[in-house]
Amino acid sequence: MIKPGSVFSPPQTPAARCLHLVRLNPIITRSELVEATGLSQPTITRATAALLEAGLVQERTDLTRTRGRGRPTVPLEVADNKWILAGIAIGTSRTHIALFDTMGRTLREDDISTPVARLSESDFIEHIMAGVNRLTTGISRTLVSVGVTTSGNVDEDGLVWAANLGWEGVDIAARLRYQFNVPVVVSSAIPAILGSETQSADLNQTGKVLVLFADDSTGAALSTEAGVTQLVPLPRISSELLNLHDSASEDNVATQAVLDALAAREISASTLAEAATIAEDNETARGILDERAHLLASIAADLVTEHNPVTVVLAGSAFIDDPHAAKLFASSLRQHNTDAQLRLIPTHREIVRAIARAVALDPLLRVPLSLQPSTASVRS
């Protein structure tokens, strides 16, 4: 079992802390690791020895430095030990599958059509397993872990609850674990957005970061020194225009709810981008899209008041496919007197690739010495 810590928690073991720092610093010495971690010299020596034995770091003997009569200082760097880390980002209609090496470089990737809500759980998982098998074919490397991100929420038992996928308590991890005989982690896509940032942050980085994701599903997550936490449930919302009265946010500001609100007014749009185009010449459509932006700002304001983040990250088609939404959101949020900095992830592709990499690397960065090449990576 993968431990310690939950998915996207900061590195806790000496080996994990050392690997994190070696990844962030192209060349670093053991003495510098002692200083950066606050751990003792013997602890660092044991941790780096274990990482060297696992092939996760290597010594740069060509950069050996000698100072006085002491022992020579040999710097360390990340090594490529021929492992494969698979990352799977499940979307409403498409799934992104990518393979990474231990340095976080993309080896292969693919997007496959997976209209999840129209597929049985078994058929969908078969599609995913086939996709991973296709990508790993012909690579002289060994799969050591699989990470999965999905819409909705993932409970403490790893079960997925996602209305837009039609999933209620789906245990995707068990099937993948059996198929590939490697550790599998499952996370909501929303914490994974922050996970991708914490994995490249300094160990001593302070300041909370909040992410608000609005797309086919809606959610938020918060990163603190203790790790990344999905914020469930979201603050409730009310809107006369949308006939919402102290209603749950998760479904009522998702894209389908917006399209349904347009359809109720005889405005037909199959995507948010199409709705935004219609709204250029249709005041009713524009009003509904604007209301969504204001409601999202209201949700964010409540979360900022409660958690006091330094930065709010915006992600999802609500802020991308509607060209007016991000500006309206920012203006509305400022009316709530928040000083939090706003940052937008500008493309869906960037989000998908980032979360696939983050969830793929999570086991390696959290428990690097627990991953071992399987003698039977794939079951027939």
Regions picked out by a protein language model, each given a short descriptive name:
Residues 81, 102-103, 155-156, 216, ...:
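Short, ordered coil/turn segments that flank beta-strands lining enzyme active or ligand-binding pockets
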Residues 75, 85-89, 143-147, 208-213, ...:
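Short glycine-aspartate micro-motif
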Residues 1-60, 69-107, 119, 123, ...:
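ATP-binding/phosphotransfer module of carbohydrate and carboxylate kinases, centering on a glycine-rich
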Residues 146-152, 214, 312-318:
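Glycine-rich beta-strand-to-loop/alpha-helix junction loops that act as flexible
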Residues 106, 115-208, 324-335:
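Glycine-rich phosphate-binding loop and adjoining helix at the ATP-binding site
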Residues 109-111, 119-121, 164-168, 172-285:
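Glycine/GP-enriched mid-protein hinge/lid loop-to-helix segment characteristic of carbohydrate kinases
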Residues 93, 153, 191, 215-218, ...:
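Gly/Ser/Thr-rich loops at beta-strand to alpha-helix junctions
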